[in-house]
A protein has these predicted regions:
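Short, surface-exposed loop/helix-turn segments at secondary-structure junctions
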Residues: 94-106
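A solvent-exposed, acidic/Ser-Thr-rich amphipathic alpha-helical stretch
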Residues: 13-14, 28-82
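Short, low-complexity N-terminal intrinsically disordered segments enriched in polar/charged residues
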Residues: 1-37, 140-141
């Protein structure tokens, strides 16, 4: 079993805010810059899940950011543990390509997103993301 050190809330907040800002800016290198070399990325509901390692996560984010324009996040709640943060927010933007098995055609969408970031030594070792796909389907339907 891995031994984790307590990570303070301010450090966890910096990680979450940095990830959100990097996604908003479309900056893949900033996104993966806070991740461990052996990071695991689990996009719940995705066919190719989970992906392992920085190269695979980098490719996934290139694909996601090519299909979406991240415009705004509205915080809902954030929960903390000694080695994780759970962040719930409302994601708003445009789906300009194909994502979640849906074609967006540039339409605006807004949905609930829940992120679980597991952290060791100040780096994200696992990121699990739940997007409210049914809400997205209803908006695009």
């Amino acid at each position: 079993m891995d031994s984790f050190q307590d990570t303070d809330h301010a450090e966890l907040d910096r990680l979450v805010e940095g990830q959100l800002r990097a996604e908003h800016d479309g900056d893949v290198e900033a996104i993966v810059g806070s991740m461990a070399q052996a990071v695991v990325h689990d996009l719940v509901g995705s066919i190719d899940n989970p992906v392992h390692g920085l190269a695979a996560v980098r490719r996934r984010y290139h694909d996601v950011l090519a299909a979406t324009v991240h415009e705004r996040d509205v915080p809902v709640r954030r929960l903390y543990g000694p080695d994780f943060v759970l962040d719930e927010h409302i994601w708003s933007g445009r789906l300009i390509g194909r994502a979640f098995d849906l074609d967006g055609h540039g339409r605006r969408i807004s949905h609930r997103a829940v992120w679980l970031l597991e952290v060791r030594d100040g780096r994200i070792v696992r990121e699990t993301v739940w997007n409210d796909i049914e809400s997205i389907r209803r908006q695009l339907g």
